[in-house]
C-alpha cells in the first residue's frame, strides 16, 4: 500500500447520526429507499424514481436483507464505536492519505474526516460544498480527478524509485 483514499469514512468514533441510524436500520420498501436517498444526496436532482426502484430491487434480493440487518442491529452506536480505530494506530499511519467528504453529509459527520486529517500526519482533506455522502456521484468529475491525480503521483514516485 502506497497511499490511502478515504471517502466519508468512519475511522474515528462519533455520536451516530440520524442518517446513519436510518441507513443501518433500513427495512425494505420503496418509500423508505426514497427517504434514504434523500439522506445520501445534497443534490436532490440526482434522486430519480428509477434510481430508487433500482436500489430498492437490489435490497430485496434473496438473503440481502437478512445479511444487512444482521450486520448492525440496534443499538447502533456500538457499531460506530467498533468501527473506530485507536487514535495512536491512526497517528502511526505512514501513508499519504487523501480524505474526501461532503460538507452536508448526513450519514458520516464532517467532523470525522476533520479528526482523521488531524491524526494522519500525511493527510490531505478535500471538502466538497453543497454535497452529501455521495461525493463520488455529486461531484463525479472533480472526485475522479482528485483521486486519479493523488494515485498517479504515487505511481510516478514509485517509477522514479526503480
Predicted features and spans:
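Active-site acidic short loop of glycosyltransferases
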Residues: 1, 94-95, 122
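Hydrophobic "lid"/C-terminal helical patch
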Residues: 68, 72, 116, 143, ...
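Conserved alpha/beta-hydrolase "acid-adjacent" motif
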Residues: 106-112
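Short beta-strand/loop motif that positions the catalytic acidic residue
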Residues: 93, 99-101, 105
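Catalytic active-site module of serine/aspartate enzymes centered on a nucleophile-bearing elbow/loop
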Residues: 122-162
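Flexible "cap/lid" loop of the alpha/beta hydrolase fold
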Residues: 2-35
Amino acid at each position: 500500500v502506497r497511499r490511502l483514499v478515504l471517502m466519508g469514512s468512519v475511522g474515528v468514533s462519533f455520536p451516530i447520526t440520524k442518517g446513519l441510524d436510518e441507513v443501518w436500520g433500513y427495512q425494505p420498501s420503496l418509500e423508505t429507499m426514497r427517504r434514504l436517498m434523500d439522506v445520501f444526496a445534497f443534490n436532490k436532482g440526482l434522486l430519480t424514481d428509477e434510481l430508487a426502484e433500482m436500489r430498492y430491487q437490489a435490497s430485496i434480493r434473496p438473503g440481502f436483507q437478512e445479511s444487512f440487518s444482521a450486520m448492525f442491529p440496534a443499538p447502533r452506536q456500538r457499531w460506530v464505536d467498533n468501527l473506530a480505530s485507536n487514535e495512536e494506530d491512526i497517528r502511526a499511519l505512514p501513508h499519504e492519505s487523501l480524505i474526501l467528504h461532503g460538507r452536508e453529509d448526513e450519514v458520516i459527520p464532517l467532523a470525522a474526516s476533520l479528526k482523521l486529517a488531524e491524526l494522519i500526519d500525511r493527510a490531505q482533506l478535500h471538502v466538497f460544498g453543497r454535497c452529501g455522502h455521495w461525493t463520488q456521484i455529486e461531484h463525479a468529475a472533480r472526485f475522479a480527478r482528485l483521486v486519479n491525480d493523488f494515485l498517479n503521483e504515487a505511481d510516478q514516485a514509485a517509477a522514479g524509485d526503480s
